[in-house]
Amino acid sequence: MPPKSRSTGPKKTQKARRRDKKNVPHGAAHIKSTFNNTIVSITDPAGNVISWASSGHVGFKGSRKSTPFAAQLAAENAARKAQEHGVKKVDVFVKGPGSGRETAIRSLQAAGLEVGTISDVTPQPHNGCRPPKRRRV
């Protein structure tokens, strides 16, 4: 009896997805700045993500992800990708207590996007979950 081959059939080659060029002149930039990372997503008015970047995605690891400089590079990266899709003006929604909030907004402006309104949408608990205990250093 011949040995069974472990082949599961023909190899499936992964096809590169073609990214459609959207033409969206006005969008929204959502900046989520936590104590560990900063995530910048640029969406169309319906909320569909056009481009995104984060401090970790840009190349920072560990505690360097939470720095303002990492947030600046992430925002510039997301803005550059969004401008390829025709985004010129954004409304900014900032969420979270992190250190990269203001830096990310400034770098969106420096990258060439016109910033309309800036809104803080940080969720506030109405006495919900118990917060983490205080650090003892």
Curated annotation (Swiss-Prot):
Entry keyword annotation includes Amino-acid biosynthesis: no
Protein name from the UniProt record: Small ribosomal subunit protein uS11
Sequence similarity: Belongs to the universal ribosomal protein uS11 family.
GO molecular function: rRNA binding; structural constituent of ribosome
InterPro entries for the chain: Ribosomal_uS11 (IPR001971), Ribosomal_uS11_bac-type (IPR019981), Ribosomal_uS11_CS (IPR018102), Ribosomal_uS11_sf (IPR036967)
Species in which this protein is naturally found: Rhodococcus opacus (strain B4)
Keyword terms: Ribonucleoprotein, Ribosomal protein, RNA-binding, rRNA-binding
GO terms under biological process: translation
